[in-house]
Amino acid sequence: VLKRSIEDRLAPANKQIVLGHGTCGGIDTEFKFNPALVDRQKVADLRKRWGIKESDFVIGYSGRLVRDKGIISLVRAFDMLEDADDCKLLLVGMFEVRDALPEDVKERIENDPRIIYTGFVNGGMEYYYSLMNLYVLPSYREGFPTGVLESQAMELPVLTTRVTGCCDAICDGRSGLFITHDPEDIVEKIDEIRLKHRIDGKFGREWVKEYFDCRKVWCEIEKLYK
């Protein structure tokens, strides 16, 4: 992001810095996004509410449901999965008028029984991450993707693109894998996780704790002001 900002001359280079490892506020890995603290009964209640079985493999996304986030590619990739009767696509977020999805994709999301569309969720995201087996963000651009960090803190493998912001938000091959916007590539990488169990989510949690925990970011902010 810093490199692009300097190249695009958004501000003088000597007035721009990267705070810590690139996130403006960090995330609370100790008291909020911590799988050890999740109330399992609440997770069970959410599973019942959304019709998700323990045996289901849940591919998750959180955020605005718009073209810019790669939702079209994600839905098409989900349609292409083979031997996927036990797969669910969990979309936590809401449709928007600006950059709206095509009507056919929107209708598919609303009507496919394997796709769970929650609409706007006000808090408790740690419980929705607890329903997922994999987090996918096929975005075209980001500042710094908070959902990618939160999901890794919840020990989820992550698939995301190599675009600005996202390219610094996973440890490639360890906490997640990079994808393109090609649905076939997304399918291939989903199956690397779903069938081959290539990524161990526990590494992702430790990586996020090390570099993006909010307390460490706050220390960097304090140093900046001093």
Predicted features along the sequence, with ranges:
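Conserved donor-binding/catalytic core segment of Leloir-type glycosyltransferases
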Residues: 53-69, 75-78, 90
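Short, structured helix-loop element that forms part of the nucleotide-activated donor/catalytic region
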Residues: 90-117
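Short alpha-helical donor nucleotide-sugar binding micro-motif in glycosyltransferases
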Residues: 120-122, 127-132
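Aromatic "clamp/platform" in nucleotide-sugar-dependent glycosyltransferases that forms part
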Residues: 140
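Conserved acidic donor-binding segment of nucleotide-sugar-dependent glycosyltransferases
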Residues: 172-173, 177-183, 192-197
